[in-house]
Amino acid sequence: MSAPNPKAFPLADSALTQQILDVVQQSQNLRQLKKGANEATKTLNRGISEFIIMAADTEPIEILLHLPLLCEDKNVPYVFVPSKTALGRACGVSRPVIAASVTTNEASAMKNQIYGIKDKIETLLI
């Protein structure tokens, strides 16, 4: 695998990537996940996104570089994971996924897990 694109910052390490993908998979089961750059953009604009996950091996990466700008405007944490294929698998689809958004739900059973990952992503951004 080639070196990740330097524009893909912050990039999660392997342990954090695994935790993020686990949360993504569980969020998908609870219908708290939006897949794709366009749907991620919609969740940000509506203010229902907890955090955004993007794939660092997206080619060309510029097709999702509008998301970090939007995230910073809306004060939503974001992170890059190394593989779009792994993100696609975690999202429960057979195709690669370049961006995903975990959405808010106050009554969710996963609220604590989501906030835990959100805190870890925020520490990467500092």
Curated annotation (Swiss-Prot):
Keywords recorded for this protein, A-Z: mRNA processing, mRNA splicing, Nucleus, Ribonucleoprotein, Ribosome biogenesis, RNA-binding, rRNA processing, Spliceosome
Cystine crosslinks: none
SUPFAM superfamilies: L30e-like (SSF55315)
Classification via Pfam families: Ribosomal_L7Ae
Cellular localization per UniProt: Nucleus, Nucleolus
Superkingdom to which the source organism belongs: Eukaryota
The family this protein is said to belong to: Belongs to the eukaryotic ribosomal protein eL8 family.
Known partners and oligomeric status: Component of the U3 snoRNP particle. Binds to the C'/D and B/C motifs in U3 snoRNA. Component of the 25S U4/U6.U5 tri-snRNP particle, a subcomplex of the spliceosome. Binds to the 5' stem-loop of U4 snRNA.
Protein name as catalogued: 13 kDa ribonucleoprotein-associated protein
Organism: Debaryomyces hansenii (strain ATCC 36239 / CBS 767 / BCRC 21394 / JCM 1990 / NBRC 0083 / IGC 2968)
